[in-house]
Swiss-Prot record:
<dbReference type="GO" id="GO:0005576">
    <property type="term" value="C:extracellular region"/>
</dbReference>
<feature type="glycosylation site" description="N-linked (GlcNAc...) asparagine">
    <location>
        <position position="55"/>
    </location>
</feature>
<dbReference type="Pfam" id="PF23610">
    <property type="entry name" value="VWA7_4"/>
</dbReference>
<feature type="region of interest" description="Disordered">
    <location>
        <begin position="238"/>
        <end position="273"/>
    </location>
</feature>
<feature type="domain" description="VWFA">
    <location>
        <begin position="314"/>
        <end position="507"/>
    </location>
</feature>
<dbReference type="InterPro" id="IPR036465">
    <property type="entry name" value="vWFA_dom_sf"/>
</dbReference>
<dbReference type="Pfam" id="PF23619">
    <property type="entry name" value="Ig_VWA7"/>
</dbReference>
<feature type="glycosylation site" description="N-linked (GlcNAc...) asparagine">
    <location>
        <position position="849"/>
    </location>
</feature>
<dbReference type="Pfam" id="PF25107">
    <property type="entry name" value="VWA7_N"/>
</dbReference>
<dbReference type="InterPro" id="IPR056861">
    <property type="entry name" value="HMCN1-like_VWA"/>
</dbReference>
<keyword id="KW-0325">Glycoprotein</keyword>
<protein>
    <recommendedName>
        <fullName>von Willebrand factor A domain-containing protein 7</fullName>
    </recommendedName>
</protein>
<keyword id="KW-0964">Secreted</keyword>
<feature type="signal peptide">
    <location>
        <begin position="1"/>
        <end position="28"/>
    </location>
</feature>
<keyword id="KW-0732">Signal</keyword>
<dbReference type="InterPro" id="IPR056475">
    <property type="entry name" value="GBD_Hemicentin/VWA7"/>
</dbReference>
<dbReference type="Pfam" id="PF25106">
    <property type="entry name" value="VWA_4"/>
</dbReference>
Amino acid sequence: MLPADVPLCHLGPSVLLLLQLLLPSASAFFPNIWSLLAAPGSITHQDLTEEAALNVTLHLFLEQPPPGRPPLRLEDFLGRTLLADDLFAAYFGPGSPSRRFRAALGEVSRANAAQDFLPTSKNDPDLHFDAERLGQGRTRLVEALRETVAAAKALDYTLARQRLGAALHALQDFYSHSNWVELGRQQPHPHLLWPRQELRSLAQAGDPTCSDCEELSCPGNLLGFTLLTSGYFGTRPSKPPGKCSHGGHFDQSSSQPPRGGINKDSTSPGFSPHHMLHLQAAKLALLASIQAFNLLQSRLGDRGFSRLLDITPASSLSFVLDTTGSMGEEINAAKIQARHIVEQRRGTPMEPTQYVLVPFHDPGFGPVFTTSDPDSFWQQLNEMHALGGGDEPEMCLSALELALLHTPPLSDIFVFTDASPKDAFLTNRVESLTQERRCRVTFLVTEDPSRAQGRARREVLSPLRFEPYEAVALASGGEVIFTEDQYIQDVAAIVGDSIADLVTLPLEPRVVVAERPLVFRVDGLLQKVTVRIHGEVSSFWIRNPAGVSQGQEEGEGPLGHTHRFGRFWMVRVNDPPQSGTWEIQVTAKGTPRVRVQAQTSLDFLFHFGIPMEDGPHPGLYPLTQPVAGLQTQLLVEVTGLGSRGGPGGPLPHFSHVVLRGVPQGAELGQVPLEPRGPPERGLLAASLPPTLLSTSGPFSLELVGQDGVGRGLHRAAPQPCAVVPVLLELSGPRGFLAPGTTAPLSLRIASFSGPQDLHLRTSAKPSFALTSNLSRVHLEQNEAAWGRLWLEVPDTAASDSVVMVTVTAKNGEASTMPPTHAFLRLLVQAPAPQDQLPAPAYSTDPVLNTSRPAFHFFTSVTQGGAGGGLVGNPWWTTFGVMLLLLGLGPW
């Protein structure tokens, strides 16, 4: 093992090469990059988290050469910005989408930043290594890492990423909030991840640690000692005499003697009295974050770790199947498509990462079957057959809700049924859940809603009985396709198409209007364009920018190949499609559906944020949907910017976003997109107009810009958004749920737009007993209320099972505002015995080393004190602190 005080210049050439990647040049410890208007040039928690993840991903790619492709070389990444798009293109092949990986990193980064914003965490000193609570902070850090591993092993990667974000926040805060850097330490603390190793040389309650400093910058306010300390923040707990403050604009304790502080969160003296040590603290926090990632990798294995960060271009395959007696053809169609996907993609980068199967059959639904093994999935699906019965309606939305709970974000879910939903009361909740999970739902319905024939019915059914499916499909960015039994196998072929990374091209107008063509735009970064039309169509034609047309005749045409399956038409446009404006003219009875999709690596992720100024640090608190009355930012992350007109050509860019009403498509406004950080990161922000934030209806986002050679680009968000009337925050207990216990939950509800009379409903899935002390609440503008919930976990609750708690806030019956939902995922785990750790390999005596090793900062476009040598074993592995660096030695 490598002693902790070995100078980095002695680590060898391969390690020094890696360090060029590790160290950003100038640009935690503000929460996210959106904080940097307050302190330009600072390194944030988001920077540290993403840089660490990219480095570990590169390490994983270097260790495992891609099948059928040349191995990656570390030298090819030196002196360049380390970007997810470049890593995926080098490993999986040009154009391989990194969208899911970047979305997973976004989940971790937002959970990290949320520690500074959530009411239950922002002022807890144990979660930030504040107030000299170093032992307690280490305990909470290790707990969060344990919870990350447990959630990942239970296949709940969303919860695992949330706990990982919390763990990384605490780990990174240690180097900014303590005096580890001031003690001259050049490497991460050797004991933070070792719960059985004592933290030595800690300042005690009676030890004075700081002198008074009346300036913003306080380089010499630490007293001359070799004890480890950290600053006090705010008033809880109160700062004892002689102790250091955190310091900065937001810290009330810094005005009490001794004034000043020691935090290194930013480059600004107004926020960070030890701003001059910001880069040194960031370097150690980055190395420690890499160490934590590697330790998780050793515990989860390469496959489990890859799932944790979604290091794959592939999506998941999720089926919700009606198994009533009339569904034989549909079940066979699902089997055929699943078998085709399994056989075609096995062993390739596009092999689905997870398979989810949920059956339903009145009066029941489930259980859910989840696996990453294609053979197990196929066996389970192959054993599924149509059962007796056949009454309409069925428990479809309950089964879909269960699938959403277990399907990874950014996935497609396919529902096969010939019945309307019996549980239509779940429609709003399922709509919100699809948007929270960013999952697209496609319903394949083998029943014409206008016919009265088909399966047995208990009553005369309304022609509007399928409207809940339409609502869920619209909210999720999916669609409802009506077909007949004889065509279901052909129509189901869209399953194989849809699990590729597709974008839906915006149409103008959004719906078919008589005698008016639909217009869509094709750019040079699109391929495999597909036009789907379904309805009572009598004729249609498609025209390309050159004026070449093709009608509805089946077979090969001048623009592509046309297939017809009853009332469903599909045109596969020849590659490469001509760039420019295309038109579609449809003549039909009723309102036909038209959908245009294409494959591309250039896409975008987005979320919303509100400026926070009352927490420990400035930043943007992330939201799934904007909240009425709150100044809201749209935050965009463009993926696939490696796509350009030619090698070395200029990057594509987006200049503004168009906001449109849903479903008609009327323009609600345009707002400019402002870049944040280097252009190659693809980070953009826009302020939503106040007029939009008073709109109760859904709206869509369309990004507009140019490719690298000046041609137009249009990308639409896959799902519509909506302004919600109130802010709901739901938080759970520390750790996991244990069978046979009652878990307390906290609820905060706030209004920023005016008086609200709200009815609150709570539910848990599975159906655990859930009680609340808040069922109705009246709020005035800028008023909030707190509530408590108690979740009873039965003795029979299965370990490693996921519980989803939902709180719904709905205005009075006369209100047209949609309800607001908050979702909380919790994991049930039986208490485990304490980990038995081997004895230290050698002495744990502190080794003081205040001399600085001969380390040189390398230019990259990316971004001796307490304790002693590298000793002992962490609770999950035997690797050492410099694991990643040691692992590169043989290279």
